[in-house]
């Protein structure tokens, strides 16, 4: 018996919509990353992007456990000397709630061109409205 290897042209990708309201950030992000990679499919191939498209709504209503709302700090650097910036989870969820889920999922995907292709299939929206109704996404209960 030969090992099955998926071909990029033959991969069937579905669209799923996930409601983040009341969900824990890390638990939701791991499930999303798994589905973006395609590891839930029998035809998973490590060097081929076999994952599905994921739409996340209600990103502003995601929760974290413990004292992480105040204690979790997100860092980025501007590129200039002394240009390190920090923002807490609490402030980032007010300013850009989509970025919280995007950063969590991006850290769980592989680095490189394949990981960037997987990340592009993630669509995150702060509210309940999204612009992908033409793709007829299925509701994914996580």
Swiss-Prot record:
Keywords: Ribonucleoprotein, Ribosomal protein. Coiled coil: none annotated. The keyword Glycosyltransferase does not apply. GO terms for molecular function: mRNA binding; structural constituent of ribosome. One of its GO terms (cellular component) is cytosolic large ribosomal subunit. The keyword Nucleus does not apply. PROSITE patterns: RIBOSOMAL_L13 (PS00783). InterPro entries: Ribosomal_uL13 (IPR005822), Ribosomal_uL13_bac-type (IPR005823), Ribosomal_uL13_CS (IPR023563), Ribosomal_uL13_sf (IPR036899). GO terms for biological process: negative regulation of translation; translation. Part of the 50S ribosomal subunit. HAMAP family: Ribosomal_uL13. This protein is one of the early assembly proteins of the 50S ribosomal subunit, although it is not seen to bind rRNA by itself. It is important during the early stages of 50S assembly. Belongs to the universal ribosomal protein uL13 family. This is Large ribosomal subunit protein uL13.
């Amino acid at each position: 018996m030969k090992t099955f290897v998926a071909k990029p042209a033959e991969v069937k990708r579905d669209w799923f919509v996930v409601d983040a309201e009341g969900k824990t950030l890390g638990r939701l992000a791991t499930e999303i990353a798994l589905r973006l990679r395609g590891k839930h499919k029998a035809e998973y191939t490590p060097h081929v992007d076999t994952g599905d498209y994921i739409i996340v709504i209600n990103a502003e209503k995601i929760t974290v456990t413990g004292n992480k709302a105040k204690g979790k700090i997100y860092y980025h650097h501007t590129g200039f000397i002394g240009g390190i910036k920090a923002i807490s989870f609490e402030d980032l969820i007010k300013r850009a709630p989509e970025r919280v889920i995007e950063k969590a999922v991006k850290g769980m995907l592989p680095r490189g061109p394949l990981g960037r292709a997987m990340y592009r299939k993630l669509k995150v929206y702060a509210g309940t409205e999204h612009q992908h109704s033409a793709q007829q996404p299925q509701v994914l209960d996580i």
